[in-house]
Regions:
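Internal, conserved structured core segments that host functional sites
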Residues: 103-105
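Long, hydrophobic/aromatic N-terminal blocks
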Residues: 34-46
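Short acidic/glycine-enriched loop/turn segments that link adjacent beta-strands
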Residues: 39-42, 108-112
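Glyoxalase I/VOC metalloenzyme domain signal
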Residues: 1-9, 13-34, 48-101, 116-185
Length: 185
């Protein structure tokens, strides 16, 4: 397992409608951020100022997010983590089973961000280099997903053993509340 410090940043869920998903979360009295528009997505952060927030993403009519939702449907898109030194982190996971997405060649240089993937793994792992790592309590306490023993080992290797747990359904445990991801669709 990596000896490097890792801090969960956010968990992103690709949904058909960020407005509908945000409305579903209002019953929990979560802090729902403003809807933002980007080149390929509409996005809303839930408890965006807290460590390990929830990011709701809606694909626009074209682009990579639209292709993702058409291919796999709505659901978990990525889990973002922060590290102090991206190159040391990437060196530390050599041989762990994670693969570096080809887009990372450009994003490592331009944005100090890498994308880890693995066929069959239900999400992308976004690794961002930061100057400091927050130590505040988590908003998202855990995420359950149908993971194999090998996938759990890979998750542990990148410092997410406290976030990911294996279960047959995708659920998020936030601020003492449990939500099946399907409720956001």
């Amino acid at each position: 397992m990596s000896q490097l410090q890792v801090s969960p940043s956010h968990i992103a869920v690709l949904v058909p409608s960020v407005d509908k998903a945000a409305k579903q979360l209002q019953k929990f009295n979560f802090e729902i951020g403003l809807k933002e528009e980007f080149q390929e997505t509409f996005e809303i952060y839930v408890h965006g100022e807290k460590r390990n927030s929830l990011l709701l993403m809606e694909a626009k009519s074209s682009g990579s997010y639209r292709k993702a939702i058409e291919k796999r449907g709505p659901g978990l898109h990525h889990v973002a983590i922060d590290v102090l030194n991206l190159n040391l982190f990437l060196d530390s996971i050599a041989g762990s089973g994670w693969l570096l997405n080809l887009n990372s060649i450009k994003t490592i240089e331009d944005y100090k961000t890498a994308y880890l993937v693995r066929p069959g793994f239900p999400a992308i792992i976004e690794v961002q280099q930061k100057d400091t790592l927050p130590m505040a309590p988590f908003f998202i306490e855990s995420l359950t997903a149908p993971l194999s023993a090998q996938q759990l080992k890979m998750v542990n290797h990148i410092g997410l053993k406290d976030i990911f747990q294996s279960h047959r359904d995708f659920t998020i445990h936030m601020n003492n509340q449990t939500l099946n991801l399907k409720e956001l669709f």
